[in-house]
Amino acid sequence: MKKLLLVNGPNLNRLGVREVNVYGKGTLATLEADMKQEAETMGVELECFQSNHEGAIIDIIHEAEDIYEGIILNPGAFTHYSYAIRDAIASISIPVIEVHISNIHQRESFRHESVTAAVCAGQIVGFGFYGYKLALFALMEKLREA
C-alpha cells in the first residue's frame, strides 16, 4: 500500500478558531480525518503531521523520502519566506504538492509570493479544505506517471 504524508505548518492547528472568514470553521482534526478517509478509498495510507516550528517541518521532509512516496504540504506562512523549507523540498526525490486553503494570490501582497512552489510538483490554492483532496488526486496522478 502506498504511503503519503500530509504536512501542515504554523497556525494550522488553529483551524476552526483562527480567521474563520478566511479558513472556515473546520478543524485540523476534521481535515486530517477526512483526508485519511479519502486516501483510504484510493487504497493509500496517509499520515498527518503539523508543526509550528520550521526545523520540525524540515526534519520530517528529509525523513519522508525514505518512508513515503509523496507529500502534500501546506507550509503556512513559511510559504512566503522559508528558503530552508524550499531547500528541504528541493533536496528530496519524492513529489510534493503545495496546498493553501485560501487563495494566497488574492490576499495581502506579502502573501502573493511562494518561495516553495518552484520546487514543488504543483500548487493548489483557494479551494478551502477541498484543495487538500485536489492535492491528493494530483499527487496520485503524479505517482502514476512516474
UniProtKB/Swiss-Prot annotation:
Catalytic activity: 3-dehydroquinate = 3-dehydroshikimate + H2O
Pathway entry: Metabolic intermediate biosynthesis; chorismate biosynthesis; chorismate from D-erythrose 4-phosphate and phosphoenolpyruvate: step 3/7
InterPro entries: DHquinase_II, DHquinase_II_CS, DHquinase_II_sf
Gene3D superfamilies: Dehydroquinase, class II
Amino acids binding substrate: N74, H80, D87, I101, S102, R111
Pfam families: DHquinase_II (PF01220)
Single annotated GO MF: 3-dehydroquinate dehydratase activity
Residues the record marks as active site: Y23 (proton acceptor), H100 (proton donor)
Domain of life of the source: Bacteria
A Gene Ontology biological process term: chorismate biosynthetic process
EC number annotated for this UniProt entry: 4.2.1.10
HAMAP family xref list: AroQ
Role description: Catalyzes a trans-dehydration via an enolate intermediate.
Protein name (Swiss-Prot/TrEMBL): 3-dehydroquinate dehydratase
